[in-house]
Structures are given as C-alpha cells and as structure tokens.
C-alpha cells in the first residue's frame, strides 16, 4: 500500500498544503524513486482528483505529489478560489523545488501529470522548466481563443465575461471584496459551468466540503486569454495524451498534439470528461498509461 505524507512547502504566494504518496520502497530513503507532480483541474482541491491519481501512481512505483494551489483548500493565499494560470505555474515550480529536496525522490528528472485544465498549467510549467523530463495529460482541456469562442458564447460571450472580470477586479482593488459565481450550477447562467454536473454536486464524488463551489469573476480574463495550443511547439519533453471523443474539447487535444515539438503518444479511450476524475475504468486506464509513459521516460 502507498505511504501518504502530509507535507507543506512554499508556493507562489504563501505556504501550500500537499500529500506526498510513496510506494512501499519509496518510503526508504536509501531507495529513491522517480517523482511526479499531479495538477488537478481548474477550481479543484486535491481531494477531488489529484489525490486519486497521485495514489495510483504511487501504487505503480512513483513518488507522486498532489497539493492545493494557492488560495484553494488547505493552502494559504488570498484572494480565495481565484483561478490564475500564472500563479498556478509558480506553485508547480515550488512543488518541484520541494520534491527535488525530498530524500525519497531520485534525481533523475521530474514527471508532471495534468488532469483536465491542469493539463494547461502542467504544459506551461514543462515548457519553461528543464527539470520536467516527462509530461502526461489526462482528459486534457487545452484551449485557445478559437475554442473559447466556441464554448463561451462566441466573441460576444467572451467579451462579456471579460467585461464582468474587469468590473470585479475594480471592485476588489477598491474594496477588497471578491465577486463570486458558482463553479457549477444549472440554475445560474453566470456560473463558470452553467450545468448540473453530478461529479461536482454529488457529495459521494467531487461535491465535497473542502470545495466551496465558487469562482472569482475577476479570473475570467486570464482564463480566456490563456493559449494552451501555442505551448505545444515549445515542449520538448516526451508527452502522452489520454483522451476520449466523449470528453471535453477533443479538437483542442488533437491540435495540441499535432503541434508538439518532441516525442509524443496519443491514446484514445472511452468515457465522459468527469469519468476520468473518479470512475474506476477510466482512472485505471489513465493511471496505467501514464505510469508506463513515466517508466519509459524518467
């Protein structure tokens, strides 16, 4: 059984709380193992899906770190529940610094696993940090402006969200008050995901008490302006994508894969987007594939 250590380390804007999952052999400092950072999807806390993948990788022989990004869950930082790609990339750098000094970790380079939107942050980090020797993206949400237009009501919808973000930013700077909308709600058209999604609303899945289901409106601009597809030509680390035609924006994954500069592999399977977060079949498929990828490339 994997060993789980509760850990804390410096992130981009305060102390971050994490869990380091180690295989039985990895708990022995004389037998270090390869390390993998796990980045969960947007707005998530570690207990929703990052812990699951970290534990599965530890079962397969890796030291795997999941953690709450700045302003989320048990980690420090304000504003709370504020989605910032730049800050999350800095947090990944801090997590890599922590793993690099841990006695259970072999100094053979770092693997990074990104789930859903975590794939964007993992890719951006890998593009700028030579410590990343291998990258795996599971059910990756990889967008650019074209994909945002297609998913957020066209150019007018995108600009409306950015205008709301600017107003919310002004309010925060003037008063310190953060304007929030639900992350998930089928009854609120302003929700970040205006649908009733079982994974996020079911307490037996991802609708857990550690996750407050709120999205800082001022985060929209950075989210919508992020171009994940443009990262692909900058990536030289071997990259694996695991996706499904029934999951989110497979066209983004295809375009990203086609633009990759380094060695790559694309595995297609079946399942909806949220199945990859907690359903045994999809998680096992993805965990097996990513473990095999990291074993070959780290």
Model feature map: region roles:
Residues 82-103:
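Alpha/beta-hydrolase active-site loop
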């Amino acid at each position: 059984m994997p060993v789980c250590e509760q850990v804390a380390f410096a992130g981009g804007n305060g102390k971050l709380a994490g869990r380091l999952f180690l295989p039985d052999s990895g708990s022995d400092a004389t037998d270090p193992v390869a390390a993998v950072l796990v980045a969960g999807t947007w707005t998530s806390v570690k207990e929703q899906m990052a812990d699951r993948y970290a534990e599965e990788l530890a079962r397969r022989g890796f030291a795997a770190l999941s953690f709450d990004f700045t302003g989320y869950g048990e980690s420090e930082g304000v504003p709370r529940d504020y989605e910032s790609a730049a800050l999350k990339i800095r947090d990944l750098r801090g997590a890599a610094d922590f793993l690099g000094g841990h006695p259970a970790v072999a100094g053979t380079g770092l693997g990074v696993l990104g789930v859903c939107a975590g794939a964007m942050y993992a890719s951006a980090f890998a593009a700028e940090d030579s410590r990343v020797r291998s990258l795996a993206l599971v059910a990756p949400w990889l967008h650019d402006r074209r994909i945002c237009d297609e998913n957020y009501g066209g150019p007018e919808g995108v600009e409306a969200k950015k205008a709301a973000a600017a107003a919310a930013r002004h309010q925060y700077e003037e008063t310190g008050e953060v304007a929030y909308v639900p992350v998930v709600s089928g009854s609120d058209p302003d929700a970040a995901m205006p649908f009733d999604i079982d994974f996020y609303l079911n307490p037996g899945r991802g609708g857990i008490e550690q996750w407050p289901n709120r999205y800082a409106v001022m985060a929209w601009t950075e989210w919508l302006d992020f171009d994940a597809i443009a990262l692909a030509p900058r990536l030289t680390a071997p990259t694996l994508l695991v996706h499904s035609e029934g999951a989110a924006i497979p066209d983004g994954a295809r375009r990203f894969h086609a633009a990759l500069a380094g060695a790559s592999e694309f595995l297609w399977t079946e399942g909806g987007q949220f199945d990859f977060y907690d359903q045994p079949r999809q998680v096992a498929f993805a965990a097996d594939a990513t473990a095999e990828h990291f074993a070959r490339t780290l």
